[in-house]
């Protein structure tokens, strides 16, 4: 009994959610040698937008220019996050491989499940499900461009 109470005090006995049940916000930044992209989603209501910005350098400053946007329901984002296993990404830090001179760097931040923060980053080293996640975001945005 005392042992169980001590585990609870340190968070060890707490149930952790295995799935995303709500998606409040998500930012994914991809950087390459000459610029990058920023994907944003904010799920404040049932119908929200997924946006992709291009990072540009103008007048001595970095600037985000909206490149594409599409309506995206919160449930669609939740399903994608679960399919790609983003809860497992939390704490991932992918070190840049030796003998690779350049590549893609990423930074992922999300708030899900009523306040749970997820953070991951890496350089040419990505968590499982990352490539599928980015392809799905690009696919959703491409569909809106074709309409």
Show where each model-derived region lies.
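A short-motif feature that recognizes glycine-rich, charge-decorated loops
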Residues: 52-89
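Post-signal-peptide N-terminal segment of Sec-exported extracytoplasmic proteins
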Residues: 33-59
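N-terminal compositionally biased, intrinsically disordered segments and leader/signal-like regions
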Residues: 5, 28-30, 49
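Sec-dependent bacterial lipoprotein signal peptides
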Residues: 1-10
């Amino acid at each position: 009994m005392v042992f169980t109470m001590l585990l609870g005090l340190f968070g060890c006995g707490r149930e952790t959610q295995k799935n995303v049940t709500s998606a409040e916000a998500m930012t994914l930044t991809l950087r390459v040698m000459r610029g990058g992209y920023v994907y944003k989603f904010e799920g404040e209501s049932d119908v929200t937008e997924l946006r992709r910005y291009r990072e540009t350098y103008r007048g001595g400053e970095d600037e985000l220019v909206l490149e594409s946007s599409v309506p995206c329901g919160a449930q669609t984002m939740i399903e994608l996050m679960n399919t790609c296993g983003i809860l497992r990404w939390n704490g991932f830090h992918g070190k840049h491989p030796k003998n690779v001179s350049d590549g893609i760097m990423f930074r992922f931040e999300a708030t899900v499940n009523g306040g749970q923060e997820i953070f991951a980053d890496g350089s040419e080293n990505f968590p499982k499900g990352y490539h599928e996640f980015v392809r799905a975001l690009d696919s959703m945005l491409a569909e809106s461009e074709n309409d």
